[in-house]
Amino acid sequence: VDKVNEFEHGIDTVNKSRSDSLYFGSISNEQFRYASSDELLNTDNGKKVFRGMIEAFFNSQQKRLKVLSSYAKGDNYSILSGNRRLDNEKADYRVRHKWGGYISSFATNYVIGNPVSIGILEGAEKKQLETIQEIEWNNDINALNGDLALDASIYGRAFEYHFRDKDGADRVVLINPLEMFVVRDLTVEQNIILAVHLPVFADKVNMTVYTKDQTITYKPYTTNAVRLTVDTTTKHEYRDVPVVEWWNNRYRMGDFESEISLIDAYDAGQSDTANYMSDLNDAMLLIKGDLEALGLSASDIAKMKDANTLLLQTGISANGQQTSADAGYIYKQYDVNGTEAYKNRLANDIHRFSRIPNLEDDRFNATSSGIALLYKMIGLEQVRKNKETYFTKALRRRYELISNIHKAINKPTIEASKLTFTFHPNIPQDVWNEIKAYIEAGGVVSQETLMNNASFTDYKTEQGRILKETGASDNEIMQLVGGMNEQES
């Protein structure tokens, strides 16, 4: 018989054990390392180790990445695959919450939602910035940076691949982390010695390996039968592996990876609530009394229940006493306050440990000043600083690769070591309060600055309008302000 008050523990069904927690073994995020790419690809022992790396990637690392992907998309693995209420007569809602996607999207847009500014150190050639701007334009680099940062936030790692297209333009493209891994050397610098791209098409792995001077393709094979048969080998002139690995942090962990158990508990709590509300509609009818004296049979009770009517008439028992009858429903007790407090606590813990501020917190919204707001976001600020450190390494390697290929083919020089990268956190700024405070402190602000900070106009547009009102011709306006930003006659 089902026990009334053990619903929330999930032990009121034939499934006596419910385990939804996930644990990724150390190999699932292990860095692959070897002495050199030549030994790894061309010696018997190296090939054996290389085959083991590929198998470990498919059997262990890719599984972790797929689980993280499911949480980022809201198809939370545990709630959908865990053993829960298997009784056919009971509700079995699997309520998913896109916490993973929310956390990664919030953190990514905060850190890199605004374009990264590239500058140069004093004494560096300024003309190289024009070359960099052309490369960024050709590759829609702001969108690419956003995608890379999002992958890093979800998976803990992200990959970009470099090549030159048929028109001789520098290309940088995103590679799915579920389809690539890198191998690093055994030095303290842990340099990348090769990158392995393993996309699967028609159930076949179409593997390509990139070394510091070669691109090697292999004949297709299945994931459960790795075969290292070289198909083609071509040279490249990057003088390094043309792949950049972006790290999210020191441990290559996703922003919500440590909070998965909390997300699972939140999903389970909401699912249990939904199940309770559904099962309450199917509560068991209880009739107490001398049913024999009432003359009721099981079929009589069933007919009355179907008619949504229950008639109970008392009478006199055989010994002359008055009979009694009572009817009601048995339903499982639900501690509303306790359950809601539990789910709120889980939600707060998810925010706390992921360092993502809870924007629905009244205490958060009550804060109006910018500096106080930043204090409440101090946790996310620490995450941002850490991400920027690793993203800067990736960006510098990006331009080192481009610099290498430009030197090899006599294209415009890029001094990667002299580039600076400035990140701009995507947070609302009260610019007008700053301007007001600056003016009150004795500072002078130009009309151009004031107009450019207005949401409804800008300097060129407004100056053009003013000149036009004074009778200036279109040619005069063009010479003075360079034309207006809006289409006006």
Predicted regions and their residues:
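A short, surface-exposed helix-loop junction/capping segment
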Residues: 128-132, 325-328, 377
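Extended, regular secondary-structure scaffolds
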Residues: 149, 153-154, 159-255
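Glycine- and charge-rich intrinsically disordered segments
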Residues: 1-25, 267-281, 285, 292-293, ...
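Extended, helix-rich architectural segments
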Residues: 1-173, 489
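Short secondary-structure junctions and interdomain/linker hinges
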Residues: 61-64, 75, 113, 139-143, ...
